């Protein structure tokens, strides 16, 4: 293990506008609440909560979705965003490139006595990866990734023991740490759909790309995909085109997929290098980190990928 670090300076400009940060971290429940509040007043939005999709069919005229309660919905276009293990995607006949990392991710929130300086920190240790994501000066979201057969080493700890373990792993950088939430865990599987569209259908969010969390960029890709698809459909509708046609939906795929493929496979390659404990891999990653740290163009390219397309 090495205490050498790769750091990224604040970017100055993205897409022609001034910025002073790589990004912001926002709790998921706040995003969901804001999304709901932004559309709940629209009369043409109908929420079907607590109902799973049991059947999906498409034809030349429409898409049809059958819910668990037996209700049947029809539309010109079906947009699926039902997780990286999407049942809808499977029913549409879209295959995926899937990589099971054999690891378990655990997420929990902590409070601490020393500030995090609003800086995200990622630590690659042998056998586990730690990410510390600032939610406030003295509040940090912790993400622990560990081989699945060793997950109980973390899941079996009390809150007090877990806080002490984080302090040890961080060498007390945040001072005394206190776990203030439950520990949530899930298997780590990366997924990239081989197509983002099918007949009268499109995939967005994790149904299209489920990223490794090391870049904290998966949600951003989901937002980008939704924005690109909405723009493509709106422009086609304004021009009098059939926005549900394959020709139109393929425009979304052509605009979005090249970027997601680069990030998906590039991230997986980095993770493989950083978690390989063989001696050649250790030497290579040490050289890569040191080289990258001293090549501003490389840092700029990485920052650009994480802040804008």
Residue ranges and their predicted role:
Residues 13-16, 113, 147-151, 208-210:
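A short, flexible beta-alpha/helix-coil linker loop
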Residues 152-239, 243-244:
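FAD/FMN-dependent oxidoreductases across multiple families
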């Amino acid at each position: 293990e090495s205490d050498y670090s790769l750091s990224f300076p604040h970017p100055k400009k993205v897409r022609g506008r001034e910025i002073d940060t790589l990004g912001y971290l926002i709790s998921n429940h706040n995003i969901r609440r804001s999304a709901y509040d932004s559309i709940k007043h629209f009369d043409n939005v109908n929420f079907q909560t607590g109902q799973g999709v049991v059947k999906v069919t498409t034809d030349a005229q429409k898409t049809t979705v059958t819910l668990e309660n037996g209700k049947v919905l029809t539309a010109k276009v079906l947009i699926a965003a039902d997780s990286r293990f999407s049942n809808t995607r499977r029913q549409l006949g879209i295959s995926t490139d899937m990589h099971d990392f054999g690891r378990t991710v655990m997420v929990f929130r902590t409070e601490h006595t020393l500030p995090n300086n609003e800086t995200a920190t990622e630590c690659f240790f042998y056998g586990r990866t730690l990410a510390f994501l600032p939610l406030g000066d003295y509040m940090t979201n912790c993400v622990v990734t560990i081989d699945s057969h060793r997950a109980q080493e973390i899941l079996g700890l009390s809150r007090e023991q877990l806080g002490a373990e984080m302090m040890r792993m961080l060498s007390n950088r945040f001072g005394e740490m206190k776990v203030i939430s439950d520990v949530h865990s899930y298997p780590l599987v990366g997924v990239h759909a081989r197509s983002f569209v099918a007949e009268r259908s499109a995939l967005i969010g994790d149904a299209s790309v489920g990223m490794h969390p090391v870049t904290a960029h998966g949600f951003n890709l989901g937002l980008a995909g939704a924005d690109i698809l909405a723009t493509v459909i709106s422009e086609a509708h304004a021009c009098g085109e059939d926005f549900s046609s394959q020709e139109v939906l393929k425009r979304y795929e052509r605009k979005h997929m090249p970027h997601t493929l680069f990030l998906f496979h590039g991230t997986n390659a980095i993770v493989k290098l950083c978690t390989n404990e063989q001696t050649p891999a250790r030497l290579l990653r040490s050289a890569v980190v040191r080289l990258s740290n001293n090549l501003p163009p490389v840092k700029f390219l990485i920052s650009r990928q994480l802040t804008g397309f």
